[in-house]
Structures are given as C-alpha cells and as structure tokens.
Swiss-Prot record:
It comes from the Bacteria. Its EC number is 3.1.6.-. One of its GO terms (cellular component) is extracellular region. Residues 1-25 form the signal peptide. The active site is at residues 88, 159. Binds 1 Ca(2+) ion per subunit. Sulfatase that may be involved in ulvan degradation. Ulvan is the main polysaccharide component of the Ulvales (green seaweed) cell wall. It is composed of disaccharide building blocks comprising 3-sulfated rhamnose (Rha3S) linked to D-glucuronic acid (GlcA), L-iduronic acid (IduA), or D-xylose (Xyl). Belongs to the sulfatase family. This is Sulfatase. It holds the Pfam family Sulfatase. Its main location: secreted. Its cofactor is Ca(2+). The conversion to 3-oxoalanine (also known as C-formylglycine, FGly), of a serine or cysteine residue in prokaryotes and of a cysteine residue in eukaryotes, is critical for catalytic activity. This post-translational modification is severely defective in multiple sulfatase deficiency (MSD).
Length: 553
C-alpha cells in the first residue's frame, strides 16, 4: 500500500468513526427548508490536480496547491467514482438536461462536431450529424428549480446553449453572466482579441465580453489588492499585479461575491451555476501566482508546469472567495449575516485533465477519451448538518446526468413529466443524506460516441458497471472492428490490463457477456445513432448479443 493510500485509508476510517457522532450531534435540517445551491464547475481540471487526498483516493498533487477546495473537501463529502462526458460541451448539455447525449432534448456528443478525425485520415464510418446546442423544448435545470421558488444565476462559460438572451428566454436564467473567455475590443484603433484578461476598448473603456461583467473589469489597484487578494494570499505576492489588467477568473469571483451579498438579504433561495473557464488552455494565470510556482521545486514528477500550477491556484483562490462570501456576505467581518449553514456547495470538473499542461496518472490518458483520465473527475458536496464532513464515498458512481434530479429533490422541485422530458439521471440525495452508501438501482453508466475526434476518440460505446460485490468494471466496444476491452477499475485504476486480451476465464467471459447485453439494451432503448458505413451507406449495427464469445480460445 502506498503512503498516499495509507493516508487516504486513515481519512476514510476517521469519517466512519465520526459519522454516528455527527448524526446525533448535528441539528437536522427542517425537511421543508430549501437550501441555496452553488454549483462550481472547473474546466479541464484533472482528477489528480487538487492537493486534497479526499477527491482522488490519495493521489492528489504534491506540487499544485488548492487549500480552499481542500477545505471544502474537509467540510463535505467527496465521491471517488465521479464521472463526466469526455469534453466540455457534451458535459454541460448533460448537466442542464439530465440526459445522455442520446436524449431527445440533448443530442450533443462532442465539441463542435463528430466529424473531427485527424487531418488526412479516411474513416470507414461516416459520423452522425449531432446537435450543437440543447433543443429549445429542453426543460433546463434552471427552469425546474425556478418552479420551487429559486432565483437562478449563471456565471462563466456558456457552451451547450446559444449565448445571450436565449439563456434567459428558454433556459430559465434570471441573472445571466455567461460568456466566452475571449474579449474582442478596439484598442488604439486596432481590433484585437485576447483570452482571460480585460481589454481597454477605445469607446467602452475596460471591459470583458458582456456588459454584466464590465463593473469588475478595472485593472488591479491598491484598494482591490488590499481588500480582496491580500487576505487570501498563499505564498504569492499580489502586489505584483498593481496596474495590470484584471483576470477573468477574478472578475467572475467579484460578480459572484456581489450576487451572494445581494441574495443573502432575499426571502427566496438561489441557485448559482459557476462554470469557470479556468483551467482550460490557453494556460494564462495571474503573474503573481506564476512567479510563486517558478520559484517552487516540484516534488511530484507528474506535475511540473509552473503556469498550470498557478492557474489551478487562481481557480482555488476564487473558490475560496466564494466560500468566504457565504460566511460573511457583506464582508464586514461580522458573520452574523452568514448563509453558509443553509447553502449546499458543489465542486466538480467538466472532464478529465488535458495532458501536456498536466498529467492524470495513475489514470489512463486524458480529456477527449473514455478512459478514466478523460472522464473521471473530482466531486465534492458540502451541506452543513446534512452531509458528513471529511467523508469519502468509495462505492457510488455519479455522472453529470445525476445532478439535475439530485438538486431537484433537494430543492423540493418536481421533475418534468417523462412525456415531456425523460431523465437519464437518478437522484443521489439519499446517498448524500447517508440513508445508504449506494443506490442499488443505480449501478450502470453509459457513454456513446458515433464519430471521430482526432486520435482520442472513434465510434464506440462504453458501459461502467458496479457488480453486486461492489467491484467496478468498464467495457468498451469499438464499432470499426467489433472489438472489446474489459477492465476491473477497482483493482486496475490505470486500465492497464484488458481482461479479455489473453485466455479470459469463463467468469470473465460471463461478465463481459452480461455487460455487453446491458449496453446493447441501452443502445436499442435510446435509439442511439451509430453512423453509416462509408463503403455501402448502410447503418452501422449495434454489438451482437454473443459478440464477446470470439474471445474464447
């Protein structure tokens, strides 16, 4: 057992020991009390990119620092088996609809298109034509929470919907600060575009892409540094920023803090969705944090890039500001106005880390793939008095599609009728309340990709299955050559050993057959598109019932 795993085991044991004490000592929430809900989503943050041991079974970074998110993990429950789609746009579509990409209101399988094979490669399968946005008849998570009396807000990356008024007109967003990370402006008569930093436009002055963020676009000055960044510094020198353009991540933090201050006085609860653009490429952190990491020696061979480390901590500092605002909304030092005790905070990432800037080891590969490095991410839920602090669920798998029904149950909102919009996700509210460690009827996850994405993805379908003995398995099916891969994730986190590769046992074959039939049934039920063969324009068939028998030798 590694030192990281020993440390993680102690954390789990501590959580088990204190759980009964917490159950008896904490004041139970009123069953009718509606919490505020804050959902924070990082962009491209990998499973091992936090320094907390809770979120990654002890494999957290020894170079990157995330003390504020680590504090959130200590105050809440982390999930070891938390999953997403393979990249950002389909994850965001799944989040807001509660549906896999096969859902009637969804249809978003990839960023941009499924026709993204590497240049010059002739593919045997002609990809499916996907949707690029959620359908306008989609009843979004925002709309459902509004029916329970929630004020809704969106701060950050938009993806999966059309930007602008449509977020308000058919997605149910009351306060809209959704935007790109790029800002276009005319500076000294020249049209320019940059990422992450405010621009000083000749006509508009300091600005980001949308007007709702303009009040927070001014350069860093002494007053801001003293009031905002000095109290949260962590070995960095924020005064290096004086007079430089504002970073988008800080500006979004400013907007969220202002929103919390305003809503803390309201009678109705709020739902704030905060999908930060950090830590997506281009890797452009604040220079004070980059200076810190350039001077710091990495003790983690997986993680050595100073600018990426700085970007992770910039994200972390902004999360810390959000958490601090919940404890002291008006920022006067008196926490009597705090709303943290009645606010659920969730931290999540939209997909696995992008290898190059970071490394997802021990997980296999990266964003864009269905191996664990592409779809397994940190996940934390905090809700004082309901969720046991410093706890880790190492059994229940959770997917993006589960957030919608989970938050609806917590908010006391009714889901859309299945005749209007069928939910693929299932609520894990009972698991959060520790009425059980798992939902017995929630032990399968599916992914389906009817197209191409450079070298990372090809037409395939995948099932994650939790066996009755709580062992987690994952089966891949590739349409081009009708091949399978099977991994035991509980024993082989890095997906290094394909159990079907060499002389599989009868027990292994039986399991693969069972998982294949579950996958096949799901594909048929959802009428999942598969594309057509280029050679004859015929529809690519689903995996055959007994296809895994070819591995019998």
């Amino acid at each position: 057992m590694t030192s990281e795993m020993k440390k993680f085991s102690k954390i789990v044991l501590f959580g088990l020991l204190i759980s009964p004490l917490l159950a008896s000592s904490q004041t139970k929430k009123d069953a009718n009390q509606k919490p505020n809900i804050i959902l924070i989503m990082a962009d491209d943050l990998g499973w091992t990119d936090l320094s907390s041991p809770n979120t990654s079974l002890g494999y957290g970074s020894k170079y990157y620092e995330s003390p504020n998110i680590d504090r959130l993990a200590q105050q809440g429950k982390s999930f070891a088996y938390a999953y997403t789609q393979q990249n950002c746009q389909p994850t965001r579509a799944a989040l807001l609809s509660g549906q896999y990409a096969t859902g009637a209101q969804n249809g978003v399988y990839n960023v941009g298109s499924l026709k993204r094979a590497s240049k010059g490669v002739v593919t045997p399968i002609m990809p499916h034509n996907q949707n690029n946005y959620l359908q306008e008849d989609c009843v979004s998570m925002f709309e459902t929470l509004k029916t329970a009396g929630y004020h809704t807000a969106w701060f950050g990356k938009f993806h999966a919907i059309k930007l602008g008024k449509q977020a308000e007109s058919y997605m149910g967003v009351d306060y809209n600060v959704a935007l790109h990370k790029e800002t276009s402006a005319t500076v000294n008569g020249v049209k320019v575009k940059n990422e992450f930093f405010a621009q000083n436009d000749d006509a508009k002055g300091w600005m980001f892409e949308i007007d709702n963020l303009k009040p927070y676009a001014q350069p860093y000055d002494a007053a801001y540094l003293q009031k905002v960044l000095e109290p949260i510094k962590n070995g960095n020198n924020p005064w290096l920023l004086e007079g430089t353009p504002k970073h988008l991540t800080d500006a979004l933090g400013d907007a969220v803090v202002g929103y919390i201050k305003d809503r803390s006085k309201a009678d109705s609860p709020f739902f704030a969705y905060i999908p930060f653009h950090a830590v997506h490429v281009s890797i452009l952190p604040r220079l004070d944090l980059e200076a810190k990491y350039k001077a710091k020696k990495s003790l983690d061979p997986r993680h050595t890039q100073a600018d990426y480390a700085a970007f992770v901590e910039l994200l972390d500092q902004t999360v810390g500001r959000v958490l601090n605002a919940l404890e002291d909304p008006n920022g006067d030092g008196n926490k009597a106005d705090g709303i943290a005790e009645n606010t659920m905070v969730i931290f999540y990432s939209d997909n696995g880390g992008f290898m190059g800037p970071t490394n997802n080891s021990p997980l296999r590969l990266r964003k864009g793939t269905y191996y664990e490095g592409g779809v397994r991410v940190p996940l934390i839920f905090k809700y004082p008095g309901v969720i046991t602090p410093n706890s880790v669920n190492t059994t229940q798998e959770v997917h993006t599609i589960d957030f919608y029904p989970t938050l609806a149950e917590i908010a006391g909102a009714k889901l859309p009728s299945p005749k209007v919009q069928e939910m693929d996700g299932k609520s894990i509210a009972s698991v959060l309340r520790e009425e059980s460690q798992v939902r017995d009827d929630k032990n399968e996850l599916f992914w389906h990709f009817p197209g191409y994405m450079d070298v990372r993805n090809m037409p395939q379908s995948v099932i994650h299955y939790r066996h009755s003995d709580n062992q987690h398995y994952k089966l891949f099916y590739r349409y081009e050559d009708e091949s399978f891969e099977l991994y035991n994730l509980s024993n082989d986190l890095g997906e290094t050993t394909n159990l079907l590769a060499e002389n599989p046992s009868q027990q292994t074959l039986d399991l693969a057959l069972k998982m294949n039939n579950k996958l096949r049934a799901w594909l048929i039920k959802n009428n999942a598109p598969t594309g057509i063969w280029a050679k004859n324009c015929e529809k690519v068939p689903y995996p055959k019932k007994d296809a895994v028998k070819k591995y019998i030798k």
